[in-house]
């Protein structure tokens, strides 16, 4: 027996002398290489640009053209980076366990088993809650920033959605530098609608002695749209013309939303924001107003309906045309002088038609493929 032990000892020493590496040394080298690879990957991401606004770190999101969009994109980017870091850690620990804590083929011994380690288990339980709390905090901070409203925006826009297009009206323009002011409320049309509604509401049910409510949210059946706004300068889309909403850069803009029929959704991908457009917003308890601090650059940005609303929902597009404040005031002057939207755009040197999308074909009988010829 002693001879056998001496033989094993001699063989082990001989293997070390000819360069066999201990298992612990191999594990250390693998750990160092893995750490180096992770470090290089993180370094590459950080030095790829001083800003996280690049195609790799946006992870599929648009860059955004408003301060609100930038904050949401940054939240998205850092959330993904945190998720990736946690994924690398979890998968790394998993593969480490699989590779280095398995039973060796030629060894009768099982790997060391680690269980019922209360401090370790409490740590693993607490870490996910900490991560969730941190993400929740930053989500609430960004959400509150996006939903903030000021009392006196520079431009107030009425947005009316209907199957399957849009109407935009300029309700009020008040540049704080005193450069331009405009009250676009069409009081005649709005007062007529409210007068009709008031007349109906004052009708008395002679049988019960109280006002007679209408069939639609208490309103008359032929006057369910009295909640809509009307403006003297409006742009209405048609099946042959995409509505172009002209807005100034560098100004606080408020959007007041309402639908004339079913539920729609106002969505400009470059705003990284969408909001449901409800009929009867007040009765439906919906917040139909949102603001953007500014549009940071000029350009044409496609807008879409993001709520399934019927046959041509997928083609219910519009365009936001961001121009300088000087061009915007000239555009409004052209519209107030009686020019159409296309004519006013051409007058300020802009394309008179949408450049980010195109009109749709409303012919329900059109076919995408030619019918086979008769033999």
Curated annotation (Swiss-Prot):
It is found in: Cell membrane. GO terms for biological process: ATP synthesis coupled electron transport. Residues 353-375 are annotated as: Disordered. Its cofactor is Cu cation; heme. Its EC number is 7.1.1.9. Binds a copper A center. InterPro entries: CcO_II, CcO_II-like_C, Copper_CuA, Cupredoxin, Cyt_c_oxidase_su2_TM_sf. This is Probable cytochrome c oxidase subunit 2. The gene is ctaC.
